[in-house]
């Protein structure tokens, strides 16, 4: 499929495979884009999808994984504060930094998806992977994704370690 680009696959490092779908390449409507993304997501034990038409991200992995793509947008100060943990409310954390604010939200959305049901997690209690130390947090890894300009993309996953049994 020429409208699908593989964004991430590091052989031997137990990382997920991530694909970017661009509906503009083959003139897909939203419904067909979503159906195509669902079809791509059957390749692993776990999968995650995110949509911001005309784009979709799909991640497949043998362990937990979450992916998110967001269009960079302006943030109202009250809305921005409603997604931050107390530790994220630093002077540099400003809603006027639209890409940073969108990246905080996208990273939290990807993490919540990797944990299970994103609706179960309050963003004010979920630390953004954007602020994690290098190497991740515990067993979790996270990375930004090279998505089209004007968008932010994140992936969070649990890497498989040597000796991990796949059922």
Question: Residues of each region from the PLM?
Answer:
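Core catalytic alpha/beta fold that binds nucleotide/phospho-ligands
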Residues: 1-167
């Amino acid at each position: 499929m020429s409208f699908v680009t593989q964004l991430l696959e590091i052989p031997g490092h137990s990382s997920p495979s991530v694909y970017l779908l661009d509906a503009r390449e083959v003139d897909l409507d939203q419904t067909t884009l979503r159906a195509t993304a669902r079809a791509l997501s059957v390749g692993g034990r776990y999968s995650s999808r995110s949509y911001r038409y005309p784009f979709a991200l799909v991640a497949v992995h043998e362990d937990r994984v979450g992916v998110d793509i967001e269009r960079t947008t302006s943030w109202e100060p009250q809305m921005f504060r409603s997604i931050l943990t107390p530790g994220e409310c630093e002077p540099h954390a400003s809603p006027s930094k639209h890409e940073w604010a969108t990246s905080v939200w996208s990273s939290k959305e990807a993490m919540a998806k990797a944990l299970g049901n994103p609706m179960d997690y309050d963003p004010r209690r979920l630390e953004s992977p954007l602020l994690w130390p290098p190497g991740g947090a515990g067993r979790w890894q996270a990375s930004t994704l090279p998505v089209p300009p004007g968008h932010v993309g994140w992936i969070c996953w649990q890497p498989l370690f040597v000796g991990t049994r796949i059922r």
